[in-house]
Amino acid sequence: MKNEFLNFEQIDRATWQQLHRKTTIPLSQSELNSIKSFNDRIQLHEVSDIYLPLVNLIHIYRKARKDLNFTKSLFLQKTIKPQPFIIGVSGSVAVGKSTTSRLLQILIARTFKYAKVELVTTDGFLQPNAVLEERQLLNKKGFPESYDMEKLIDFLDKIKNGYDCQIPVYSHEIYDIIPNKTQEIKSPDFLIVEGINVFQNPQNQRLYVSDYFDLSIYVDADVEHIETWYLERFQKLLTLAKNDPNNYYHRFTQMTYPEILSIAQNTWKNINLANLEKFIEPTRNRADIILHKAENHEIDKIYLKK
């Protein structure tokens, strides 16, 4: 076991799935297919074996948070207004964070009756391409300096204190922030914040994004598997973009396969792998829960912080 996992309890899949009594899975395979990332693979048994026990654990964390807030209100002799339970989800590009986040959104909404569950991605807090070009950071897109972290922290602070917010929306099709389009977040009971950067050091070193999380999850996998998934995703993005000249990836569809593969491999090595090794993976041990995925995309190990 690596030293960084000394403060975690490792739980194998067989043990984990026994931690929740068998119940009816609250979604169908077609629903599951509609929410998964297009290069990801997930079946209903993964929901039953992994995610239903995870939602049960989320229930435990949320109850503990509510009990703590109630006790603090007695100590302070004042009422503490209800706050959303905020879950951070991090991990590498192409590891399956989005699938995990969207699945949790549905399962939580169907487990906690009448709960409003919102999901935001930190892609919306990327600087627009025009700003990145001006600062000569376009080739560093996804690295910490390409995000408006102050805006992200301001958003989380407002949400935690009961304010409604509007945040920018990012499009992978145009590879940029969509002008004049926002996502409104209004009084959620649960907020899931998904992104590669949610556990990273802030630029001002005074406040962490993760300071606002009630529970943090890191989706993990061996690097060689993530690389394979990334290259598969790149190829599928080109297939989707083939007949859409407005799609950012359309420009690559006119190239030969060796040229495309070379671009994808260089992007992985010089941007995504570098970002993973320097900024993302070092934050892994800040998570409360680490979900480790095997080559077949199924979660084979769970690490729970002691």
Swiss-Prot record:
Catalysed conversion reaction: (R)-pantothenate + ATP = (R)-4'-phosphopantothenate + ADP + H(+)
GO molecular function: ATP binding; pantothenate kinase activity
Keyword list, A-Z: ATP-binding, Coenzyme A biosynthesis, Cytoplasm, Kinase, Nucleotide-binding, Transferase
EC number of the protein: 2.7.1.33
Pfam families attached to this UniProt entry: PRK
Cellular component per GO, a single term: cytoplasm
Pathway involvement of the protein, from the record: Cofactor biosynthesis; coenzyme A biosynthesis; CoA from (R)-pantothenate: step 1/5
Sequence similarity: Belongs to the prokaryotic pantothenate kinase family.
Protein's UniProt name: Pantothenate kinase
